Amino acid sequence: MKLEEFLQQKYNYNPEIKDAIKGYIEQWKSWYKGNVRSFHNYFIYNGNKKVKQHRYTMNMAKEISEDWSDILWSEKCEISFVKEDSQKQFDKLIDELDLYSIINRALEKSGALGTTATVTSVYDILQNEDGMYLDVSQAKVRVDTVDVDWIYPLSWNNKEITECAFGSVEYVNGVKYVICSVHRLNEQNEYVIYNHLFKDSNGNLSEITEEQGTMKEFPTHSNIKWFSVFKPLLTNNLFNNSPFGIPHYANAIDNMKAVDISFDALKNEIKDGRKRTFVRSDMFNYDNGTQKMVFDPEDTTVYQLPSGATKDDLIQSDSDVLRTTQQIETLNTNLNILGSKVGFGENHYHFDGTNLSTATAVVSSNSKLFRRKKKLEIGYYNDILNLIKSVCYAATQFGTYNIDTTDMAIQFDDSIIEDKEAESVRASREVSQGLISKAEYRERIFGETEEAAKKAIEEIEEATPSVDKLLNNADSNDNSSNTDNKDEENNNKGEKDKDNKNDKNKKKDNKNKDLKEE
């Protein structure tokens, strides 16, 4: 029994959905590996027979997928939380899971094969027979990347895949097993994960129902998906209403062929640029002394002439000037066209005769690369957001973490696209001119949510009083000082008046005393 047959019988899976695009997926896998048998294997006729050749390749499908993954996600990207404690716990969790690497691989694989997925799970949970969780103190979260071959959509709409089955292969003591997890919504609109284990005998699967250590039915008690299906935000022009995506180069296959033909021609120009020898057919006979052939019949630089030529035509040779300059120019022209087709714009790739280089300069915000990057971020944002939410929920509900994902924000890295310092200066000017608020400034420059931005501004204003407040305090201090001075002046005046009165009374007493003596 095949896994598709099992899913069809038990979960009403429709195999036609994947069968329709399977041929393209196999083609994309070949290009991603850099070896398309129908293209990279060819023959050259040497005058006697066809000699098998293998075309040199620049493996641009891998290069394109890697470059887009690096542009979209790097260590400069930020995942931020409003609560400081949640941020600290999440930073610890992503280190344990190596989450940034998982996201980067998912972006590359989806860009290379059109679709890939991440699946979140937990293990080392102690559970009783009734399905109650007894101990989660040792529970660990795990995130697996699933290739398109093992993705089986069950329910989807124009926006997303809502129910899906995933397969994976594991070997135990040399025995091959297939593990299948099915994510479905129950009547309460909460996800339940059904796990199945199969023993694989040369492609024939037999389910193992008594396996210990695996929860056959795992209720998540949440509507958060424990899987994320990554697809580039490119319209699937091969199949309408398909849940599968297409790679970055899906509509540039002919351009990749042109690049490899040019590269192969350049390599052969150098390899075959030595003297080419034309030999009459009877010269290919065995040497009488050694019984070995005089010329190697597999050598493409030796061309066998038909018999009947004159004695002077037994062996001839020619040597031409190498045309490497023209070959390199042609190769770079094809690289420019390919780069433009896959969204990088012109001059993204350049071959200098030895190595392939990639443009690293900061590009204009109006460039094709910038616009394609922003478009892809729109689609990948929700995929990454759902992955993070599932990881945080699993670690909180079935582990020892406590992470609040409310108002969580993801900030992509735009340092290669735009000058952040210049953007900050421009945004500051807009704040001073009243064109945008301080909260809008923080949202744009720091990638914060509106709530987080307002909270940060409040904290800053509390720690740093405004100019008006400082002036008001200064006025209050001045008024207080003036009042104190006035009171002091009044007191001094009172004391002076009192002294003057005493002196006046004293003089009067002395005068009365003198009159009495007389």
Question: Residue ranges of each PLM-predicted region?
Answer:
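Activation/maturation switch segments at domain boundaries
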Residues: 313, 426-518
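Charge-rich, acidic-biased intrinsically disordered regions
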Residues: 126-134, 281-299, 357, 389-419, ...
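C-terminal amphipathic alpha-helical
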Residues: 100-119, 266-275, 320-421, 431
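Generic structural marker for isolated residues within well-ordered, non-membrane alpha-helices
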Residues: 90, 335, 388, 438-439
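Charged, long alpha-helical assembly modules
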Residues: 318, 330, 337, 422-425, ...
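Extended, charged amphipathic alpha-helical segments
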Residues: 209-364, 411
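Extended, helix-rich architectural segments
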Residues: 1-161, 496, 506-508, 515-518
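Extended, regular secondary-structure scaffolds
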Residues: 117-244
